[in-house]
């Protein structure tokens, strides 16, 4: 099993896709001898801010949603940068479902008062500052100063990760748009047979690379796969770092049957 960074807890939020992608990036760096712990709150904040302004620009027709797909995190990193966990985290657990409703009401208030986009963004940021915390403008690490984008590029380049999927209803060995409602950024992936996907996952793990897995009956959970194992009946599993905290029998890990994957 690969070494892992600290287990986090997404609470009741649907932000597993952020937790899982950042965990994958963190553990890729661990494999290179580099320790990095990234801020989920920062990426979640920027996505929520983006959703808020989309609601404003559509005059309230866009519903704010915290759901997404893990590869979207790569896009968010390239747009807004990144922060270390210690630089930006809430000292009290945040109910992001409540916060998203609060932001939605803030945008609706701005629309009702006919505020322009600049003032609306100020109002949204005020709420985010009050509920998550004020953001540093720079990242300081190891005696060096980085902009948020510089720091993001130091931990993840735009084309560093490859997106693969296995969908029977889609053309095989073709790059397709992932046909899920949570795909807000028109993310694409190479569609390959299921057995090929499993082999690629196994190969990556044996080479010391974590694998981001996103799946379920309705593409409804994302985790960072860190190893393989089997039980006393011979059933094979992928072992994953989950984002449901450590107060559970598996101490924050998730065991996924290979035939389920």
Q: What are these model-predicted stretches?
A:
Residues 1-164, 205-207, 243-250:
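Active-site nucleophile-adjacent alpha helix/oxyanion-hole segment immediately C-terminal to the catalytic cysteine
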Residues 5, 122-261:
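Active-site signature of cysteine proteases
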């Amino acid at each position: 099993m690969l070494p892992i960074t600290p287990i986090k807890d997404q609470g009741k939020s649907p932000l597993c896709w952020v937790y899982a992608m950042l965990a994958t990036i963190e553990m890729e760096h661990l494999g290179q001898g580099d320790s990095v712990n990234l801020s989920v709150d920062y990426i979640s904040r920027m996505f929520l801010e983006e959703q808020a302004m989309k609601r404003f620009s559509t005059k309230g027709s866009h519903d704010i949603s915290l759901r997404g797909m893990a590869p979207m995190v790569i896009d968010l990193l390239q747009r807004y940068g990144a922060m270390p966990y210690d630089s930006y985290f809430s000292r009290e657990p945040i109910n992001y479902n409540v916060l998203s409703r609060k932001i939605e009401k803030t945008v609706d208030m701005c629309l009702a008062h006919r505020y322009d986009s600049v003032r609306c963004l100020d109002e949204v940021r005020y709420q985010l500052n009050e509920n998550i915390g004020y953001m540093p403008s720079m990242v300081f690490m190891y005696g060096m100063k980085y902009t948020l984008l510089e720091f993001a590029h130091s931990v993840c380049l735009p084309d560093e990760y490859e997106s693969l999927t296995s969908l029977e209803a889609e053309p095989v060995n073709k790059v397709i748009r992932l046909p899920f409602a949570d795909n807000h950024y028109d993310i694409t992936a190479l569609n390959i047979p299921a057995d090929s996907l499993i082999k690629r996952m196994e190969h990556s793990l044996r080479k010391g690379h974590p694998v981001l897995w996103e799946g379920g009956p309705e593409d409804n959970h994302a985790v960072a796969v860190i190893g393989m194992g089997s039980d006393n009946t011979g059933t094979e599993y992928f072992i994953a770092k989950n984002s449901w905290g450590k107060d559970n029998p598996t101490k924050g890990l998730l065991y996924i049957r290979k035939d389920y994957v």
